[in-house]
Amino acid sequence: MPLPDFHVSEPFTLGIELEMQVVNPPGYDLSQDSSMLIDAVKNKITAGEVKHDITESMLELATDVCRDINQAAGQFSAMQKVVLQAAADHHLEICGGGTHPFQKWQRQEVCDNERYQRTLENFGYLIQQATVFGQHVHVGCASGDDAIYLLHGLSRFVPHFIALSAASPYMQGTDTRFASSRPNIFSAFPDNGPMPWVSNWQQFEALFRCLSYTTMIDSIKDLHWDIRPSPHFGTVEVRVMDTPLTLSHAVNMAGLIQATAHWLLTERSFKHQEKDYLLYKFNRFQACRYGLEGVITDPHTGDRRSLTEATLRLLEKIAPSAHKIGASSAIEALHRQVVSGLNEAQLMRDFVANGGSLIGLVKKHCEIWAGE
């Protein structure tokens, strides 16, 4: 399928997607009933969309195009109420978190969807292993060239986004020692990590043509890069965050990305170059492994800085942009989080360290989501 022309969209508008866990009490393992829930809510959603993701234990909540985080929060809140009621009617529960702490990938059923079934044929068991749960944020762009500039700019802050959203310390019944283990699942995919270097939209079109020759890539949705342009929507999509445990944190993360995008495209402080990516995977690893305690290295100067310090600097830089687009509340909340030194991964570990079980952890996450 050829790459569509870049659809011009209003700059800095938002679209947010949350991949949620569908769980089956009282054992709190993943359920295989997302299709049933989607059928139950499809005529009750007035704004946004509830839809499938890769496997039957995943439920995606997606906003419409939103002006700001307040509009997105309102849409999510309304969807949340409908989904929670449908889940209760079917004796199911819903929660966030980047991974389910003890599910077995072998039990996961891929959705009866043509694209997902084709992906299963291409990637085999890797698709079942990809039963992990992330937050994706789309930001509107006025042109393809702006999208490429924004993609490179946001890529500088991938470690910051990962560290702030880290919520997947447990996997397959084990403490992984990572703050965010979810991104590791995609390491075997041939398109894992950053997009190959291009400097403008014309070069991106040539890159996509080359990738399509592999027969594995039919559309932009078949690419699993950390950040990717989405020409159909006219956006850049950031895909590195774990799904948070609360809607409020999800909205705050979206506000962070929206404000960072506004700052990048209005200030244009960076002259991007391929060398910017020289230490990308090392810095990304630090964020996944250690969260805000990780240390990132500047590929140009060799300077090293903790992610705590780097994130506080970012929040300070983008504060004026956040004020202009109505995202100041998000930046203030994230600042408090960084100063406190806590993220959701650490809260999960604290629960288990205090005698909680992994079953109890999922139950608590469901209570958090339902009680917000």
Curated annotation (Swiss-Prot):
> Does Hydrolase count among this protein's keywords?
no
This enzyme catalyses: L-cysteine + L-glutamate + ATP = gamma-L-glutamyl-L-cysteine + ADP + phosphate + H(+)
SUPFAM superfamilies in the record, alphabetically?
A: Glutamine synthetase/guanido kinase
This protein's UniProt keywords? ATP-binding, Ligase, Nucleotide-binding
Function (record text)? ATP-dependent carboxylate-amine ligase which exhibits weak glutamate--cysteine ligase activity.
Complexes and interactors? Homodimer.
Protein name per the record = Putative glutamate--cysteine ligase 2
